[in-house]
């Protein structure tokens, strides 16, 4: 079958606030006998590194017949399996759950490795971003999750082809994840786009307020808007003055 779609077609796949298979956005999906087209040409997406670091999806696709590299976020919870070590009889298989939309040491490294491979192949890169940040657990910190996150920045700095970061509907890009794929990392080649229903920011609103709107600012605002408080402060000042 042909793997070339018309360039000016609409992306008709329906997205949800609930976790979903990101491949439906990349490849398109058939629902109720109707084809909903995804971002890339129908039947062109080829995933790589499938069984490693499943919170990140990486592969190659075509867009209007042009080959491109693709990195996307898995929004569903996935299972990570570390097999028992045959050299250690007392070891056991370790099965853990990894939340979607979070970079873990393995998925951060997978992201950096995929960027490097796509750069070496001379392909444009599409990053479909939906990350809340990096895993902050003690185990993941011990496994150097932030070091692998810095590898992502290193690879984007060295990237020579166009990079398009896209935040789809109902997705979010927050905290350290926003910093890692900020287009200012490589202004010459990187651009960022977002659906009007997406959300992004380095800090949550409460965090921004706590930094910008400190205790003294709150006190002045309270006094400006509360006549009773102004009266009490005036009485307190007189009492202190008399003493």
Task: Identify what each model region corresponds to.
Residues 1-243:
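Ligand-binding clefts of soluble mixed alpha/beta catalytic domains
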